[in-house]
Amino acid sequence: AAFVAQDPEGQNVRQGLFKLPDYCSNYQAEAVAQREGVICTNKELGHPGVQSWVIASDGSAVLASMKGQRRMTSLVGEVVREVEDGHSFVYVPGHQGHAGNEMVDALAKEATVGGRRVELAIPRAYTRRLCRDRSWQLWSQEW
């Protein structure tokens, strides 16, 4: 997961790279990137010339959860709790040439080997898949 904070001219002000456990989903990676981006930009709000931040994300599922259109996970709840006045969120389609999004995608790949380690709860979907796979394995051995 990764985020980039840019000024109005498109210059990088801050960035963050985060290595997530292998069991994490893309949804969790998007939520971590948004949470960490909000935490970072909260520190910048109120500095001279900094009135607001626009958080652009290609994570439509996380954005929908934040707006209440989907069930909000505890991780997305953390994003919502961290948001202060001066933040707005916008969806940008991924892999469509948006410079900031392309940069973040490249940083996210980099983060898989060199990012700051982040621990997250194991998602229910992952444990269900492990149980299902194990059940199939045992069944195939028996029959």
Which residues does each PLM region occupy?
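RNase H-like nuclease fold core
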Residues: 1-47, 51, 66-67
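C-terminal functional segments of enzyme domains
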Residues: 44, 48-143
